[in-house]
Amino acid sequence: RRDLSSLLRMRGDTMTVFHYEWKRSRKYILIWGLSLAVCIFSMIPVYYSMIETPELLPKNFAEGGFFETVGISLALLLEPLGMYGFLNAFFALAGGIFGMHFALSLFTKECTENTAEYLFTKPCGRIQIYKGKVLCLLVGTCITSAAYILASFIAMIVYESGFSMLEFILLAGSFPLVTLIFGGMGVLLGCWHPNNRSPLLTASLAVFMGYCITAFSRTIGSRIISYLSPFSFFISYLFFVIFFYELVYFL
């Protein structure tokens, strides 16, 4: 069996690194994609049944501005896609953790797994190696996002009819965008500080901090603070008003 160093010497291209990383990561990617798909498909009917029978909701569930902190208004919950937007806001947390943890794992592997496999960089250099890792991250994000969006779409068709396709695309599309943003942050952090032995803990703390910043900025109404968190870029109730993302956050 050829090891990575011999493959690099023979071919010396980005795709070699990508194929190698893909073989090592595909099980991790497929588990994430399948888990997200099963969870969203199972939770959509449960939450829709709760809205249809409001007496089952906790008495103070709608008080205290809770829904506003996740970008959903109470009135919007009565719309066909309102509850999906509520669920999507929390699944975005999982997407952010996946993206950042996967990126950190790719770029800190030499430290966390005590391996020197990427010290043999003469055939193609670090730039090609990094390109291969980033390509693996992009493919992994596409697969998990496709599984999540497809399961969401099927569940919405089965359990909730009459929804707007444009609004659904905007809501569901925020999941891969959040995943990519946190994945990019993981790439930058992994390149800057590769000696990270706790990539999962780092990713979880970063995503949770981003969520707290967004919730805090919405609570006090501070737009300046909202720029510090990727979750602020995708406010669900605005999709139903302007029918697009707020481009100012991407400038």
Residue ranges and their predicted role:
Residues 82-109, 204:
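Long, hydrophobic alpha-helical segments
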Residues 1-14:
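Short, Lys/Arg-enriched N-terminal segments with co-localized hydrophobic residues
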Residues 106-138:
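Helix-loop-helix units of permease transmembrane domains in multi-pass membrane transporters
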Residues 99-103, 151, 184-185, 230:
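Hydrophobic/aromatic residues in alpha-helical transmembrane segments
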Residues 37, 41-45, 49, 81-87, ...:
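Secretory targeting signals
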Residues 11-36:
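Aromatic- and glycine-rich beta-strand/loop motifs that create alpha-glucan
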Residues 17, 25, 42-80, 192, ...:
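Terminal transmembrane helical anchor/hairpin motif
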